[in-house]
Regions:
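Phosphodiester-processing cores and adjacent nucleic acid-binding clamps
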Residues: 1-156
Length: 156
C-alpha cells in the first residue's frame, strides 16, 4: 500500500540552538522537511532566534536551486502569569531557607520546611508559547521581546 503524501507544515521545531532539546542545524531541518514534501518550516528555538541567519541563507540557496520552500521565523517563549508574584515567591523561598538554617535542630528530629511555601517547582512553573512572525513588523516585535527578555530579571 502506497501512502499518499499530505501537505503538512511543522510550526514548532527545535534546532541545535535549543540547548538540551534540539539537534541539527536549521538547514538540515529545512532539507528534511522539503525532502518530505513540505513547502515551509518554522524553527522555534528556546528564547532565541540564533538559527535565523542559517534559515535565511539556506532559503536563498534553496531558491537558487529552484526549490519552492519558505522559512517561517519564530521563537518558543515562556509565559508566567505574574512576574511580581514570581519575584515575591522567589524572595519568600530565599527567606525560608535562611530561617531554616538559623534554627538549631541538633537536639531533635524536627524537620524545618513549609512544603506549601517552599516548593521550588513553583518557581519553574511556566507555560510555553510559540510566536511566529507573519511579516517584517512581526519579526521586529519578536526581536524586541527577545532583546528585552535578556535584560534585568531575564523576563519580558
Amino acid at each position: 500500500m502506497e501512502l499518499k503524501k499530505e501537505q503538512f507544515v511543522n510550526l514548532h521545531g527545535h534546532s541545535c540552538f535549543s540547548l538540551f532539546d534540539g539537534f541539527g542545524f536549521p538547514q538540515e531541518h529545512m532539507d528534511f522537511a522539503h525532502g518530505n514534501g513540505s513547502k515551509a518550516l518554522a524553527l522555534t528555538d528556546h528564547g532565541s532566534m540564533n538559527g535565523l541567519s542559517y534559515q535565511l541563507l539556506h532559503a536563498k540557496q534553496m531558491k537558487a536551486e529552484g526549490k519552492d520552500f519558505k522559512p517561517i521565523f519564530g521563537v518558543e517563549a515562556y509565559y508566567i502569569d505574574s512576574l511580581d508574584e514570581w519575584k515575591e515567591l522567589k524572595e519568600q523561598i530565599s527567606l525560608d531557607k535562611k530561617r531554616a538554617k538559623e534554627i538549631d535542630t541538633s537536639d531533635s528530629a524536627m524537620v524545618v520546611e513549609d512544603e506549601q511555601r517552599n516548593d521550588k517547582r513553583a518557581l519553574s512553573r511556566k507555560r510555553h508559547i510559540v510566536l511566529l512572525a507573519q511579516n517584517q513588523k512581526g519579526l521586529e516585535n519578536i526581536y524586541e521581546m527577545i532583546s528585552k527578555s535578556y535584560g534585568g530579571d531575564y523576563f519580558y
